Amino acid sequence: AFGQRLKDGEAVDLLFKNRRATVSLGYIGLYEAATAFFGPNWETNPEAKEFTLEIVKALKAHTDAWGDEYGYHFSVYATPSESLTDRFCKLDIEKFGLVPDITEKEYYTNSFHYDVRKNPTPFEKIDFEKDYPVFSSGGFIHYCEYPVLRQNPKALEAVWDYAYDRVGYLGTNTPIDHCYKCGYDGEFTPTAKGFECPQCKNHDPQTCDVVKRTCGYLGNPQARPMVHGRHVEISSRVKHM
């Protein structure tokens, strides 16, 4: 793939120079950073939005400079974190205590995402987030939360059409949980330890299937339990339609 073979004793990193490999600088918690300065409802404040864009622009400038200095390709990764959303928040709770709308939530928001507790329309969420990925060449994801829309697929198509030339990667989160005991299809109810069928209260991972967007990927938190902070974040999500 690199068009060359190393000689005995040569360092393997020679193959990765000239930007042939990527080192990513990830970030989470942009929502919380702006909340510390502008309050919890800053998403509609143009000054606050520009403040967050300046943060990611600064990260991008640093990675570009590192690429010139070291010869590798450095990129900014708008991270859909899994365990760090819990770990970083716990560390800050130890240092700063429970700060309203920041550490008090027990999780940090992924990358540049809109506060999951709020319910903008899918179009408003896309419009808010679309300005960040240009500074996140290492990867990113947008997503919107929906109720069951089996009888209204045109609603999803309207969002997809709107997103087509505005964002590069859009996840669609619709409830597809299933209980094999009572036959329920829909969305399971979050509990302190996981999720349960709202109809028969079943929570046995052997007899139910629960699908949630854990970070960037879709996971089954009943079969593979997630960290506390991510569970709280998923349980806090509201629908955008």
Identify the function of each model-found stretch:
Residues A1-M241:
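Long, C-terminal-biased catalytic regions of enzyme "large/alpha" subunits
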